[in-house]
Amino acid sequence: MGGRSSCEDPGCPRDEERAPRMGCMKSKFLQVGGNTFSKTETSASPHCPVYVPDPTSTIKPGPNSHNSNTPGIREAGSEDIIVVALYDYEAIHHEDLSFQKGDQMVVLEESGEWWKARSLATRKEGYIPSNYVARVDSLETEEWFFKGISRKDAERQLLAPGNMLGSFMIRDSETTKGSYSLSVRDYDPRQGDTVKHYKIRTLDNGGFYISPRSTFSTLQELVDHYKKGNDGLCQKLSVPCMSSKPQKPWEKDAWEIPRESLKLEKKLGAGQFGEVWMATYNKHTKVAVKTMKPGSMSVEAFLAEANVMKTLQHDKLVKLHAVVTKEPIYIITEFMAKGSLLDFLKSDEGSKQPLPKLIDFSAQIAEGMAFIEQRNYIHRDLRAANILVSASLVCKIADFGLARVIEDNEYTAREGAKFPIKWTAPEAINFGSFTIKSDVWSFGILLMEIVTYGRIPYPGMSNPEVIRALERGYRMPRPENCPEELYNIMMRCWKNRPEERPTFEYIQSVLDDFYTATESQYQQQP
């Protein structure tokens, strides 16, 4: 499979303004046939299609790996890691291992998102997507257990179409490490469909309880008990929350890919610096491809930034899969069925979304930006056009960091026709000072876009008029349908002094609990 490059630079998540040398992956830039392209030091001949390893990939050999000299391997005789398939998987690469739901496999090597495994039934070996399996006898094999999901995402999933009264999940507690919470779909005549949460407490002997009068030695027993009757809960437990099969991980070792591996099928839109296409990668994976106009950025600067963008992985950020580094540069990302949030809000479906859903979109974006903030990164071009929407109405942030490497004066100079003046903080317009706090200003404008269903900010005003108005202290007025509390967040985002603007972490906490701030998020013991 060739050598893989891992991010060994502890400075990967870096300070707000970075030195020109960016990225975690050491690449060489070669001149071949007049074209500059990048390859790692272990790549094949420059004349055949080049696949360069993922900069985020790491190898962790399993206890059953044959290489006994590999650091980190367990002593001989250590227990095998046996996993069970949670879903069916049909091999799409020649080194993959197909399996059916319920099949058991022994893990030979844990390497990023693809693990090498051997089927216990067929003895065949190959790579398996790690998010399709779970350790045998672990809670993850239970259909009602949702690992690593937040309280807010539990509510989003339980309230999604297809679930019913009493649909439930058990998840890891966000606040108490090693503890669990039970989330149940309920109905309230005042609020409509709602979700109630119960803390699952632990006994000294390892048992579990919600109410001290009913204790259980396992979570399975607890679930069985509350399926028979509600016994103080809001509802009797009915069926586990519906869950869709997770996205397959991107192909192993395919970071810099040849253009021939992509078939562009449908043009989805055109922006200032190129086009966006729906495409198929290697005849098997649907993706989105952003094609950049030649000359819009330097290949070296783009690749360095892309190597860092690749390490920023979060549910509310669009997944960056791969790049084509010969001009025209291609950026390959996950496909988002509903397109940009701006287009969605203006569509028939989007324009019918009620205010609570608009607040939920805002909370999802704030969550993604809180992650970017925590990683000391900056977006630089946050607006509804750069948020993408999935089929299940999950909002994800796109194009983070891309503005940094654009070399078009029309975009980089404040007088330029493409410079997004109406979204840009005054200190970034006047002094080129882009920080996470200038992103917070842009988020305030994005909130206004959302609550007005995609209306252009500062309607009727030209860019120079906006700059002059801001200097006089003007701020957009509150739209009729906008709650005071939401407008207050916008006004805090638009404070003149960057340090007085809130953090994204704070904004997320307010938006997550916009309708529940006055009541406890967890039910009292029944």
Swiss-Prot record:
Residues 1-20 are annotated as: Disordered. The SH3 domain mediates binding to HIV-1 Nef. The gene is HCK. The active site is at 381 (proton acceptor). It catalyses: L-tyrosyl-[protein] + ATP = O-phospho-L-tyrosyl-[protein] + ADP + H(+). ATP binds at residues 268-276, 290. GO terms for molecular function: ATP binding; lipid binding; non-membrane spanning protein tyrosine kinase activity; phosphotyrosine residue binding; protein tyrosine kinase activity; signaling receptor binding. Changing residue 411 to A: Reduced catalytic activity and higher affinity for target peptides. The modification Phosphothreonine is found at residues 36, 202. It comes from Homo sapiens (Human). Residues 144-241 form the SH2 domain. It is found in: Cytoplasmic vesicle, Secretory vesicle; Cytoplasm, Cytosol. This is Tyrosine-protein kinase HCK. One of its GO terms (cellular component) is intracellular membrane-bounded organelle. Phosphorylated on several tyrosine residues. Autophosphorylated. Becomes rapidly phosphorylated upon activation of the immunoglobulin receptors FCGR1A and FCGR2A. Phosphorylation by the BCR-ABL fusion protein mediates activation of HCK. Phosphorylation at Tyr-411 increases kinase activity. Phosphorylation at Tyr-522 inhibits kinase activity. Kinase activity is not required for phosphorylation at Tyr-522, suggesting that this site is a target of other kinases. Ubiquitinated by CBL, leading to its degradation via the proteasome. Pfam families: PK_Tyr_Ser-Thr, SH2, SH3_1. Interacts (via SH2 domain) with FLT3 (tyrosine phosphorylated). Interacts with VAV1, WAS and RAPGEF1. This interaction stimulates its tyrosine-kinase activity. Interacts with ARRB1 and ARRB2. Interacts with ADAM15. Interacts with FASLG. Interacts with CBL. Interacts with FCGR1A; the interaction may be indirect. Interacts with IL6ST. Interacts (via SH3 domain) with ELMO1. Interacts (via SH3 domain) with TP73. Interacts with YAP1. Interacts with ABL1 and ITGB1, and thereby recruits ABL1 to activated ITGB1. Interacts (via SH3 domain) with WDCP. (Microbial infection) Interacts (via SH3 domain) with HEV ORF3 protein. A lipid is attached at residue 2 (N-myristoyl glycine). Residues 78-138 form the SH3 domain. The modification Phosphotyrosine is found at residues 51, 209, 411, 522. The modification Phosphoserine is found at residue 462. Non-receptor tyrosine-protein kinase found in hematopoietic cells that transmits signals from cell surface receptors and plays an important role in the regulation of innate immune responses, including neutrophil, monocyte, macrophage and mast cell functions, phagocytosis, cell survival and proliferation, cell adhesion and migration. Acts downstream of receptors that bind the Fc region of immunoglobulins, such as FCGR1A and FCGR2A, but also CSF3R, PLAUR, the receptors for IFNG, IL2, IL6 and IL8, and integrins, such as ITGB1 and ITGB2. Subject to autoinhibition, mediated by intramolecular interactions involving the SH2 and SH3 domains. Kinase activity is also regulated by phosphorylation at regulatory tyrosine residues. Phosphorylation at Tyr-411 is required for optimal activity. Phosphorylation at Tyr-522 inhibits kinase activity. Inhibited by PP1 and A-770041.
